[in-house]
Regions:
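Anionic-ligand binding region
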Residues: 142-174
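Short glycine-enriched, charge-decorated loop/helix-capping segments at active-site entrances
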Residues: 45-55, 143-148, 226-233
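Conserved radical SAM core fold
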Residues: 47-48, 87, 112-115, 133-151, ...
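Auxiliary Fe-S-binding modules of radical SAM enzymes
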Residues: 166-276
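Conserved Radical SAM active-site core
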Residues: 1-128, 137-138
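Hydrophobic faces of well-ordered beta-strands that scaffold small-molecule active sites
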Residues: 27, 78, 106-108, 129-131, ...
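Alpha-helix-loop-beta-strand connector modules within alpha/beta enzyme cores
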Residues: 94-105, 156-164, 236-244
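Non-cysteine beta-strand/loop elements that form the S-adenosyl-L-methionine
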Residues: 123-138, 209-218
Length: 276
């Protein structure tokens, strides 16, 4: 088990939703690799090329040492980023922390390309699910993420998360999420209809009471800079149209981003602290 922990970064990250990061940040564990192949991935340095792996084959005890060091600074939560392909390792880290006497809020930060059974097996271990619901159209999923079955698989996974957590999001005294579900959606340029269809799917298949995070932080990476659609940033009018649809459909809980957020999320995983 220990030989398989390929870690891209373990760091304090302050760029998640306010209820996830709080003011001090969350201890995020960024795993190398990914089970999706999104053309526009903002973390492509570690998810696709695999060229930036700060700690290949890292031992569990060393991971726990680093996480405990951050938790000891007063950070109350641990996030597992891109964990779908390493779920046994996620479980091992949580159980290892518990054995050391630490029970932080655990956040499963996923692209939602998870089997329903996998999510079911995380019940009782994960406090907050933070899934990204990317597409409902299989053709778009195929073109942009090479995953024709993404819409069906993601919906089943998110339904299981909803079954476990419902629409209620509970908070600690500092306003940080302690338990529940927050569904993310990144609005992509030129795909406004798709974004509205994603919101419609959530409303019809789950509830308009769930907490949503509608993200505007898309930035064209070097991978897609010449792409006819993905090669530009999101227009303000495009994002505002999706925000308006969110309100019209009756969603009442969630967060939206400022349009300059695409300047804030540009990690450099060759650095010890990618977000500084």
């Amino acid at each position: 088990m220990d030989a398989g922990f390929n870690i891209a970064s373990i760091c304090i990250h302050k760029g998640e939703e306010p209820v996830i990061s709080g003011t001090d940040g969350i201890c995020n564990i960024f795993f190398a690799g990914c089970n999706l192949h999104c053309l526009y991935c903002q973390n492509h340095e570690i998810s696709q090329s695999g060229s930036v792996i700060r700690s290949p084959g890292m031992e569990l005890e060393k991971i726990l040492d680093q996480v405990v060091s951050i938790l000891s600074e007063g950070i109350p939560a641990v996030g597992f980023v891109s964990p779908s392909h390493v779920v046994p390792q996620v479980k091992a880290i949580i159980k290892g922390l518990n054995l050391r006497g630490y029970k932080p809020v655990t956040v499963y930060n996923t692209n939602s390309y998870d089997k329903k059974e996998t999510i079911r097996g995380l019940s009782g271990l994960i406090d907050v699910y933070l899934p990204d619901y990317k597409y409902v159209n299989w053709e778009i999923a195929t073109e942009y993420s090479d995953a024709e079955d993404y819409p069906a698989i993601a919906l089943k996974a998110i339904k299981e998360m909803y079954y476990q957590k419902g629409s209620t999001l509970t908070f600690d005294e500092d306003g940080r999420a302690e338990n529940g579900l927050v569904i993310r959606h990144l609005v992509l340029p030129g795909l406004i209809v798709e974004s509205k269809d994603v919101l419609k799917s959530i409303a019809e298949e789950l509830s308009t009471g769930v907490h949503l995070s509608l993200m505007s932080q898309y930035h064209p990476t070097s991978q897609v800079i010449n792409h006819p659609i993905l090669g530009r940033s999101l227009y303000k009018e495009e994002y505002e149209a999706v925000v308006e649809a969110m309100g019209v459909m009756g969603f009442r809980n969630g967060w939206v981003q400022d349009m300059d957020s695409n300047q804030n999320y540009r990690p450099d995983f060759s650095k010890e602290h990618p977000f500084e």
